[in-house]
From Swiss-Prot:
Pfam families: MutS_I, MutS_II, MutS_III, MutS_IV, MutS_V. Coiled coil: none annotated. It comes from the Bacteria. Belongs to the DNA mismatch repair MutS family. One of its GO terms (cellular component) is cytosol. This protein is involved in the repair of mismatches in DNA. It is possible that it carries out the mismatch recognition step. This protein has a weak ATPase activity. Keywords: ATP-binding, DNA damage, DNA repair, DNA-binding, Nucleotide-binding. This is DNA mismatch repair protein MutS. The lineage of its organism: Bacteria, Bacillati, Bacillota, Clostridia, Eubacteriales. GO terms for molecular function: ATP binding; ATP-dependent DNA damage sensor activity; damaged DNA binding; mismatched DNA binding. InterPro entries: DNA_mismatch_repair_MutS, DNA_mismatch_repair_MutS-lik_N, DNA_mismatch_repair_MutS/MSH, DNA_mismatch_repair_MutS_C, DNA_mismatch_repair_MutS_clamp, DNA_mismatch_repair_MutS_core, DNA_mismatch_repair_MutS_N, DNA_mismatch_repair_MutS_sf. PROSITE patterns: DNA_MISMATCH_REPAIR_2.
Amino acid sequence: MGTVTPMMQQYLDIKEQYKDCILFFRLGDFYEMFFSDAELASRELEITLTGRDCGLEERAPMCGVPFHAADNYIARLVSKGYKVAICEQVEDPALAKGIVKRDVVKVVTPGTVTDITMLDERKNNYLMSVYKNGNFYGLASVDITTGDFYATRITWGNTRGKLLDEIAKYLPSEIIVNNELNSDNELTSEIKQRFNTYVSTFEETSFEYGNSMDILANHFEKQTLNIQEYDIAVNASGALLKYLESTQKVNLSHIQKFNSYALEEYMILDASSRRNLELTETMREKSKKGSLLWVLDKTMTSMGGRLLRKWIEQPLINHGDISLRLDAVEELKNKFMVRVEARELLKRVYDIERLMGKVVLGSVNCRDLIALKNSMCQIPYIKSLLNGFEAEYIKNCGEQLDCLEDVCNLIEVSIIDEPPVTIKEGGIIKDGYNPEVDKLRMASIQGKDWIAALEASQREKTGIKNLKVGFNRVFGYYIEVTKSYFSLVPEEYIRKQTLSNCERYITPELKEIEDTILGAEEKIIQLEYSLFVEIKEKIAEQLSRIKSTARALAEIDVLASLAEVADREGYCKPEVSLSDKIEIIEGRHPVVEKMTDKSGFVPNDTVLDMEEDRLAIITGPNMAGKSTYMRQTALIVLMAQIGSFVPAATAKIGLVDRIFTRVGASDDLASGQSTFMVEMSEVANILINATKRSLLVLDEIGRGTSTFDGLSIAWAVIEYIVNKEQLGCRTLFATHYHELTELEGKLPGIKNYCITVKEKGEDVIFLRKIIRGGADGSYGIQVAKLAGVPQSVIDRAKEILSNLDDADINRSGKARRIKKQVDGQLDLFAQAAKASADAEILEEIRKIDISRLTPIDSMNILYELQRKMNNRE
């Protein structure tokens, strides 16, 4: 067995340190992969798998990609959940003694992508760290491209459920966990399946409290005292920073603030409610179009787009903060011309947050700096527009805007207006910025002028009419003469290269000027790069000022976007208060009215409080608009609490601390849960975690099981909710159990509502208007007909329904008036049970073959039927 070559041994030594990564190993102009990495990469990237002699008996499997095109291949691997370690040559091959030194300069993972072209510009790319200690969890999240860093802890209640809810809020691309969480196979599997995210363990020592505090204290310095208050969030935060340091291997100074928060500081939205309300994407297509974000996002900048998404995902519960936003939106809505001008200026602002991330992380180029300069040029005009505003929020934003003239001027005088992408080939520094660069450029230019003059003089001197002076990287400058003029070549010409149709020569004089030109150009390239690094570092020193300004621009952008939507769509300013009353007049669903003919959308009122209008029971057929109505109420409340105007004539919103929705049902095949089990799990979560200030939106509770079981559960849930000692919160409750409408007047705080329907022959027209009272029928067969069910099935359904009518089962399903009470509660089931027993006895009578009965048989059957009737009563 052979011994591997020195180069391959170097590869294996580095690969040993990065076992969980695909190693991109730089060899000349290519990144090469070997052995199992090569086999994996060739399959995933669909590139050719070859081999390379490595000193062993068999050739090493190998594949590679050009270094200049590597970003695209790295992006494809990372998008599939792989980590990629970038191994570069860290010394000049010309100066190397033996094997060129190589080392990993960066590890690219799903959560640490810094290449903006690989990311959604309007969405944060979060890396999350989760630390588990018993039933407690510490969380930390960071977007490395912007420097946003957040941390919290989960130490009470259903901590597992709250953890999943926080993950649903951030939707991280990658999660690192400690060993205790990793050993919880059920939880880690659920996280991977539900959120389609990359989960891996990280060194346990980095999760230890002492080590984490040291890491955080070293990075955040003066903020350490505040950090200590968040105990197990410290463990997660320290590990997160350590992971970034170990993968990025660069300065992380753009992560400037430790933003700690408690879950209760914002409206709580569980994962199910976020999904059901389609806040940022639709349930089916996972598309932005059709979501609330799609309606509200008229932002002009990427920064504003990301901030608006965050506002929607994290509504406020502080009345004062909400009022500040609403007042700002109102003034921007009213000042139409100023808003238009401000938005036009914002359109010219690039993604300052991510550009500054590139500055600090070392991936910025000159075109990025020009984009930064052009963005800063808009700030004085935007600041001037804000001077006349009265809204406190806007005035604060104006004060935060720093015109950054010094930074803008630095880039203006130093970087050419249209620079190349690369920063290592010169041609990026303006004339007049640096005397040495100017001097070297003059030498280079003069040398090239001399070359041009030489060509003319040599033609005249030799008589070679097509003589020319050329250049290539291998031979440098040369004099080229074609075959037809070989006889005229002077003796002092030194032959350098022979080609099929010509020969190339040099002269001592040409070689001397070549040294001058090339020496100057090489020095220019080195000097320009050094100057670029110096300029970049000067800009990085102003990071705090620039980030603060970028944040203010993003806030103005979001407020202006909300004002624009309010103006275009005819939204009203909601009156948000600390009361318990929700009163929406002529409310509309913000998305549905946008997706359909606006003039055809039927507005509806909503009244909820914690007294007489605690719980609204809503009945009506499928497709009539119950779900739309309930969702629109939840969305209007949420919109009000992010500081947005709302689609209604008027709206009074008593603050809501959390919104829970139970809408629709489907089997959770991944966890082996049936539709009914999923439904009951969601109901349990709601009843356990809801408070008196919560808003519940419940649709078809109990429909996943038998009629009597479902009715029993729905009834019990209503009892629990309306009971002030147990819950007593504001609730919309849609149901097909018409028997539940009898609860109005029997239990406190319940009101019946229904969707109006117009019958036209055997057809129905859904009027989509909510009115007081219970529905007259479910219209199931008519809905089936509208859905396109074959006519033969419709006809058979009518026949069966008619037979059931004969069996004395009320066709409409409408509850009969109940006089009897059992233990102080309504006997809602007695009548339904009686009807079911009657139907069974009638069916037995139908099956009797009278022609074959003896008198004794007849008497026995009659006796048995009588016994059943007596037992029924």
